[in-house]
């Protein structure tokens, strides 16, 4: 009998340890903020994540500040950043100098503002006159290299307009006529929905009367609206994340529906440019963030939603554990409730699990800093993925594809791993694309996925003649980066072959044949390249020889390259 009670006691103690409060409210020195934005970034490249925070302070005044992480303690640094409220911010190394820059949009006493700050190092930030759209309160913005030239580009939406800016690579930006719908109180997110190597754009918000969601498929820099049954929402968030680890990005949307009732939706990506509603059982939430995160280091993306719920005065912050079978269970995390909220996740103390900053209004303006103590509560410590290898390159004119073998990870499924590329014109340089990671250790400077997404390849267009050197790292669901691979290289020759982004190959697919139309009289070379950059076959085509058999091709995505009279045309082909 004594042994029986001892067993029960040990079981209870184990359960108490397992379900002990995983998030510890920690004194951080961060000010109480509402109607704002917050982000982790290693601004001084010292291998720990600093914090930038902006919004409305406890006296209802605009506020903005940077806090340096000193071994887990945060120190306010005078930077001269102009305060904004009702704001959004986004981190990127827009000038490829190895320091994390940021853009912020919102309002202050002078009206609507959008500011770009260049990080000069040592917490010195220079305000850059970029000429960005002043979108106003409740707007959003996001960085991505939409045209595959290595430089981060920027989309801004709010006040019924959406504007895309192409990074010229010289510190300036050019407005692009992309045909994107104008929105109010939007949420924006970039992600490769069709796994073709181009970042696609997800938008959710007020498009005129009710909440709408739009997906723009990026086809070599041209955006085409995808017809879907996805329902959008107003005053919430929209994010990409691979919830079921099938290699396809799923969607999380929160906000208010047409009846002004808070909702939370999950849509599963079927892998064929269609999406299915997933009954995830989430509580409807608006006026706050929605995050895909792996808080428990099991390799599955969990969900946090914070903000206003249905009913007068109701608000909550809820954490949902991914059960690994496409369903979610609420986890009793004990997080503070707030609306007009913002959040940031990152491993600030480098202990192998991601921690949480939560800001918002819960009677008063508040900021909570939660240290994730799951490792001490019998959860596993995260480890980095293996280093990518088997680097491969395909080069045609000023076009190049680099690819690699997929990594593995002890916690994250292989399909969930994202990849991050650094590349420059000299060994070890990043003047073509920045990884926002330490090149020596792989330590991440931001809490984000890799710049290649879940693809095992990355496309570059409009490259200048010269030598190129690149390395690749793998990043798991908890944003832990592997070391970088061995260095690969390739050369772009100064040939007369030029790509044309706006002309496509004119072709039709008939069964197992590709029929090429409008070919020149002179013979041209057609190359079929797999999505990961491997050359499958080459053919000489002409007016009299315009059919290519595809019987031997496996189902998948391929790129057709037609070198026609010194002009390289490219089109995507799906078998």
Model-identified regions with their sequence ranges:
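Beta-strand-rich modules
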Residues: 460-480
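Glycine-aliphatic tripeptides that mark coil-to-beta-strand junctions in extracellular
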Residues: 47-53, 98-104, 150-154, 197-203, ...
């Amino acid at each position: 009998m004594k042994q029986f009670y001892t067993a029960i006691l040990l079981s209870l103690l184990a359960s108490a340890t397992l379900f002990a409060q995983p998030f510890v409210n920690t004194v951080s020195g961060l000010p109480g903020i509402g109607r704002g934005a917050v982000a982790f970034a290693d601004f001084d490249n010292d291998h720990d994540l600093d914090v930038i925070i902006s919004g409305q302070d406890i006296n209802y005044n605009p506020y903005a500040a940077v806090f340096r992480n000193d071994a887990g303690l945060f120190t306010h640094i005078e930077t001269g950043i102009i305060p904004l409220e009702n704001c959004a911010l986004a981190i990127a190394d827009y000038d490829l100098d190895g320091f994390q820059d940021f853009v912020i949009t919102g309002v202050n006493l002078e009206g609507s503002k959008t500011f770009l700050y260049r990080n000069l190092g040592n917490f010195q930030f220079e305000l850059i006159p970029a000429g960005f759209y002043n979108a106003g309160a409740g707007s959003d913005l996001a960085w991505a290299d939409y045209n595959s030239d290595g430089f981060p580009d920027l989309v801004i939406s709010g006040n019924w307009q959406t504007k895309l800016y192409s990074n010229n690579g010289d510190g300036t930006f050019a407005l692009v006529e992309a045909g994107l719908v104008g929105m109010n109180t939007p949420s924006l997110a970039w992600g490769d929905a069709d796994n073709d190597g181009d970042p696609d754009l997800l938008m959710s918000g007020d498009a005129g009367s009710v909440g709408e969601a739009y997906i723009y498929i990026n086809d070599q820099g041209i955006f085409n609206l995808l017809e879907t049954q996805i329902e959008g929402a107003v005053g919430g968030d929209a994010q990409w994340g691979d919830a079921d680890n099938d290699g396809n990005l799923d969607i999380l949307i929160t906000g208010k529906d047409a009846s002004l009732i808070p909702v939370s939706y999950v849509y599963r990506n079927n892998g064929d440019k269609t999406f299915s509603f997933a009954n995830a059982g989430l509580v409807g939430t608006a006026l706050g963030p929605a995050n895909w995160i792996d808080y428990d280091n099991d390799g599955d993306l969990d969900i946090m939603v914070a903000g206003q719920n249905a009913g007068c005065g109701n608000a909550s912050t809820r954490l949902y554990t991914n059960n690994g079978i496409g369903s979610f269970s609420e986890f009793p995390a004990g997080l503070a409730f707030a609306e007009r909220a913002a959040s940031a996740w990152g491993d600030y103390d480098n202990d192998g699990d991601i921690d949480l900053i939560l800001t918002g209004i819960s009677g008063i303006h508040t900021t909570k800093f939660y240290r994730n103590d799951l490792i001490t509560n019998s959860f596993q410590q995260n480890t980095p993925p293996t280093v990518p290898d088997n680097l491969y390159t395909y080069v045609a004119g000023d076009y190049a594809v680099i690819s690699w073998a997929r990594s593995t990870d002890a916690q994250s499924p292989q399909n969930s791993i994202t990849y991050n590329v650094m590349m420059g014109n000299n060994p070890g340089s990043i003047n073509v694309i920045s990884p926002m990671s330490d090149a020596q250790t792989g330590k991440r400077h931001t809490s984000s996925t890799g710049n290649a997404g879940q693809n095992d390849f990355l496309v570059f267009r409009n490259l200048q003649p010269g030598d190129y050197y690149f390395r690749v790292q793998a990043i798991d669901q908890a944003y832990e980066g592997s070391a970088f691979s061995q260095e690969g290289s390739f050369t772009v020759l100064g040939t007369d072959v030029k790509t044309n982004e706006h002309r496509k190959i004119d072709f039709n697919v008939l069964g197992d044949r590709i029929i090429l139309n409008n070919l020149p009289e002179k013979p041209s070379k057609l190359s079929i390249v797999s999505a990961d950059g491997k050359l499958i076959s080459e053919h000489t085509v002409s007016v009299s020889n315009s059919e290519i058999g595809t019987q031997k091709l496996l189902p998948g995505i391929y790129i057709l390259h037609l070198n026609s009279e010194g002009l390289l045309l490219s089109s995507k082909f799906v078998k």
